[in-house]
């Protein structure tokens, strides 16, 4: 609805209706700063120009209630009709509220951790960013697919295969069993460097498609992925497809990429094949002397396939991949292909210190999830509920705490995850939003028990607090559209916190169930509309909207 309000304001401004000068404002529902731009050209004060524009405006929109000129700003205020239509649209559209009719096929590649052990807490920041972006794009109307790109041809995988051959797999969660084999194999290689030749032979045999070697690699990778999928499922993340990089060697795409680069005279051959990129210090190796390709070569092939099949493709990568991302994009441009849009994210630490990932010393995502679940259970265990219900709520609160804390920080900022803060019901957390949703559900349940009348929202009954809340509710589709454009999922987390906080202010200041009948119907409509926005919003963040807490 707010998107419609923006359209009406642009139309009302006529020749001055340039969207880039419109701002959300604390002092108005929407403000134009066009007068500040025109002041330089016309050699008048912004106030004079804004006064003139407002004086000559002919507003015909039923959604614009009033317009004011204040110190150079042109302030627009929504009408009662706009407020009424907002609440009615939310209640009518219900689960569909927030949906946009945008079209197109989008591919989002995220997580894509090496299959040599369990995910750590940095990996799940990647997963949560990618999954949230995918959910929001789907809400916007796009046909979205998510991929996990499996690095099954890398050196780490060959070391894992060697480790499984030498030490076997222990009876534990599959990805953790694979990690132990990988760690032991690394120790073995350090004390027996002559085994490096065996690793190289494994890599070459796998790339050449040797049947027995392929079987060993597939077993190792599938075992790791089995455990990784279990972890992702606990935080409500699933991928549409796991795409193995070896597919692009087998299906000819790697050969196609190398062939085009060779044909265009872009590769140097000195045993190995390399490419020199303008603006980069070092040449990029595409093929080793023994004929095996590198990760970037196979990734180029994957992105050639993406170009052929998708209009828009987005990768989520750690900040340590910035150089790699720039090299990949540059070579794709040389191939005449579109590079991916990349969301880079910074690393995650715990209050006790940063993660360490080599000799078995890392904080796995499984450990983190288990810890947060235990703490959520401690908080909820004293509640007067059935045991099973408490367990389900504790799990939902734990997953919500992790997902929300990981998404509320802008991807480019380093974050520290503190479970005690993430589980605080009074802070800016998922549990605070879940509790707000449960509060709205509780109010509506009590209203039904009391014989809830037909809801009827009336704009003219709105107090300032009610008006503020309804205007916020109108912005959900607008925020969805912003994220599609800006790829900043933290903006949606901020929006939902604002809705929850404003709703709780409304509830504190406005009796609902004890209000007189007309006001009661009006306020119950606001509560129900808020419930819809909080529920739909939590689902976009991959968090369960609890009805009881």
Curated annotation (Swiss-Prot):
Query: Which biological process annotations from GO are given for this protein?
Result: arginyl-tRNA aminoacylation
| Principal location listed in the UniProt entry | cytoplasm
Origin species, per record, is Archaeoglobus fulgidus (strain ATCC 49558 / DSM 4304 / JCM 9628 / NBRC 100126 / VC-16)
Q: Which PANTHER family does UniProt cross-reference here?
A: ARGININE--TRNA LIGASE, CYTOPLASMIC, ARGINYL-TRNA SYNTHETASE
Report motif location: 'HIGH' region. Answer: 113-123
Q: What is this protein called?
A: Arginine--tRNA ligase
Instruction: Give the catalysed reaction(s), semicolon-separated.
Output: tRNA(Arg) + L-arginine + ATP = L-arginyl-tRNA(Arg) + AMP + diphosphate
Protein EC: 6.1.1.19
Q: Which family does it belong to?
A: Belongs to the class-I aminoacyl-tRNA synthetase family.
Single Gene Ontology MF annotation: ATP binding
State the NCBIfam families in the record.
Answer: argS
Q: Establish whether keyword Aminoacyl-tRNA synthetase is in the entry.
A: yes
């Amino acid at each position: 609805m707010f998107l419609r309000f923006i359209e009406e304001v642009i139309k009302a401004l006529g020749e001055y209706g340039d969207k880039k000068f419109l701002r959300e404002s604390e002092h108005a529902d929407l403000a134009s700063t066009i007068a500040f731009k025109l002041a330089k050209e016309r050699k008048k004060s912004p106030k004079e120009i804004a006064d003139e524009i407002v004086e000559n405006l002919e507003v015909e929109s039923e959604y614009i209630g009033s317009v004011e000129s204040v110190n150079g700003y042109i302030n627009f205020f929504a009408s009662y009709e706009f407020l009424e239509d907002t609440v009615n649209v939310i209640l009518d559209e219900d689960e569909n509220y927030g949906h946009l009719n945008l079209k197109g096929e989008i591919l989002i590649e995220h997580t894509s951790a090496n299959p040599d052990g369990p995910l750590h807490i940095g990996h799940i920041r990647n997963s949560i960013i990618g999954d949230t972006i995918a959910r929001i794009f789907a809400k916007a109307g796009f046909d979205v697919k998510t991929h996990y790109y499996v690095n099954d041809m890398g050196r780490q995988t060959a070391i894992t295969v060697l480790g499984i051959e030498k030490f076997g797999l222990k009876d534990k969660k599959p990805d953790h069993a694979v990690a132990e084999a990988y760690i032991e194999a690394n120790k073995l290689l350090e004390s027996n460097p002559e085994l490096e030749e065996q690793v190289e032979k494994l890599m070459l045999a796998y790339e050449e498609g040797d049947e027995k070697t392929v079987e060993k690699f597939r077993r190792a990778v599938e075992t790791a992925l089995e455990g990784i999928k279990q972890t992702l499922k606990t935080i409500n993340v699933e991928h549409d497809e796991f795409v193995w990089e070896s597919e692009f060697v087998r299906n000819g795409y790697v050969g196609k990429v190398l062939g085009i680069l060779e044909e265009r005279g872009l590769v140097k051959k000195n045993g190995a094949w390399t490419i020199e990129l303008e603006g980069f210090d070092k040449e990029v190796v595409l093929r080793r002397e023994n004929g095996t390709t590198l990760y970037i070569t196979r990734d180029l092939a994957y992105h050639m396939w993406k170009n052929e099949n998708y209009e828009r493709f987005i990768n989520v990568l750690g900040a340590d991949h910035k150089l790699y991302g720039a090299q990949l994009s540059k070579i794709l441009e040389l191939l005449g292909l579109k590079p991916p849009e990349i969301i880079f994210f910074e690393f995650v630490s715990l209050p006790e210190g940063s993660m360490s990932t080599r000799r078995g010393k890392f904080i796995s995502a499984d450990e983190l999830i288990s810890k947060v679940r235990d703490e959520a259970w401690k908080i909820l265990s004293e509640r007067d509920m059935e045991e099973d219900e408490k367990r389900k709520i504790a799990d939902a609160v734990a997953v919500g705490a992790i997902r929300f804390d990981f998404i509320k920080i802008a991807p480019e900022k380093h974050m520290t995850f503190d479970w005690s803060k993430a589980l605080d019901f009074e802070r800016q957390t998922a549990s605070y939003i879940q509790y707000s949703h449960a509060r709205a559900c509780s109010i509506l349940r009590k209203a039904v028990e009391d014989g809830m009348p037909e809801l009827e929202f009336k704009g003219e009954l709105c107090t300032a607090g009610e008006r503020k809340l309804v205007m916020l509710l109108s912005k959900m589709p607008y925020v969805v559209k912003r994220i599609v454009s800006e790829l900043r999922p933290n903006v949606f987390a901020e929006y939902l916190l604002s809705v929850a906080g404003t709703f709780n202010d409304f509830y504190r200041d406005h009796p609902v169930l004890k209000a007189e009948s007309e006001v009661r119907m009006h306020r119950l409509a606001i509560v129900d509309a808020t419930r819809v926005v909080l529920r739909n919003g939590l689902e976009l963040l991959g968090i369960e909207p609890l009805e009881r807490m």
